[in-house]
Amino acid sequence: MTISLMIEKKCERSFFSMNAIIHGIVLAFGLILPLGVQNVFIFQQGALQKHIWRALPAVISASVCDTLLIVLAVAGVSVIVQELPVFETVMMAGGFLFLLYMGWVTWNIRPNTSQNEKHTFTPKKQAAFAAAVSLLNPHAILDTIGVIGTSSLQYSGLEKWLFMAACIAVSWIWFISLAIAGRLFQTIDTSGRLMLIVNKCSAAVMWAAAGYFGVSLFCN
């Protein structure tokens, strides 16, 4: 009887652990999949760098930022952040100015030209820009902290750690995959014409996001 109960409890715990992992994976993909400035930037760096490993500063920076936000969310910081309206205003203003500049830089990138080296981001610049597009987006931050933080409340102990680890793993895998996809895209686009269109569209996405932040600031 005792052995039977032990087996039953072990199976039950395994079920809840697997449920936490699957929940984390599905939730993280749902938050990270939509087209945004962060995704566009990582894809772009994968395409613009001569070798895929040269895009690692952007990938690592974005992944570390997401990891930090996820850890803070599970740690319960969402409650504090949501009680500080000034936080959203400051982040929105910073995001507005940064995205205007970032859009201008992206618009002027010319793939496969003599000036390509001039516009290729250095490792430090990649890391800084990736961190900026990750952290200067108040809505993305509040969504990540709020949704993941709230969802993590139903778990405790090992299940909470597994849920958090699953969310973090999805983030790293996704950004690595985006950079690889960008590199593959560049190998197909030998003329650079498609990449030029991608750059223009990327700049448009950044300016649209900046415009949204500007309207939100004005309305508030």
Curated annotation (Swiss-Prot):
The protein's name in its UniProt record: Putative amino-acid transporter YisU
Pfam family membership, one: LysE
GO MF, one annotated term: amino acid transmembrane transporter activity
Transmembrane segments: 15-35, 67-87, 89-109, 128-148, 161-181, 195-215
Listed InterPro entries: LeuE-type (IPR001123)
Keyword annotations: Amino-acid transport, Cell membrane, Membrane, Transmembrane, Transmembrane helix, Transport
Organism: Bacillus subtilis (strain 168)
Family listed: Belongs to the LysE/ArgO transporter (TC 2.A.75) family.
Predominant location: membrane
Alphabetical GO biological process terms: amino acid transport
